[in-house]
Amino acid sequence: MTTFKLVISDPKSGIAKQIEISGANAEKLIGKKIGDQIPVKELGLDLKALFGKDFPEDVKMEIRGGTDKDGFPMRPDIHGPRRVRILLSKGPGFRPKEKGERRKKTVRGNTISPEIVQVNVKLVY
């Protein structure tokens, strides 16, 4: 049985809430990629109870990233659910200390798999 920590951010209010989903709702996320949008109704979440305000009926969640079981971040430019070691100069998974610095870092692909533990999403309405 798959379990995900789902970090839901509301960009209009600047509030983020973390919940845990498992079972059939978590299985619906497997195979989705960064940038995909999922209707909130599909996961059966009650946003009013979480955020304390009403949302439109057609509100969706856009996947923005996540981390795997060992803490490696997902990158939108690496395709598939694989873990790779790539040379990075900027972006998710690397913060350069000097101008022009590049390093090899391990990152996760852009597809959600059972090895992913945390999924970051933002509300789109």
From Swiss-Prot:
Keywords: Ribonucleoprotein, Ribosomal protein. GO terms for biological process: translation. Pfam families: Ribosomal_S6e. One of its GO terms (cellular component) is ribosome. It comes from the Archaea. InterPro entries: Ribosomal_eS6, Ribosomal_eS6_arc, Ribosomal_eS6_CS. GO terms for molecular function: structural constituent of ribosome. PROSITE patterns: RIBOSOMAL_S6E. The keyword Ribosomal protein applies. Belongs to the eukaryotic ribosomal protein eS6 family. This is Small ribosomal subunit protein eS6. The lineage of its organism: Archaea, Methanobacteriati, Methanobacteriota, Thermococci, Thermococcales.
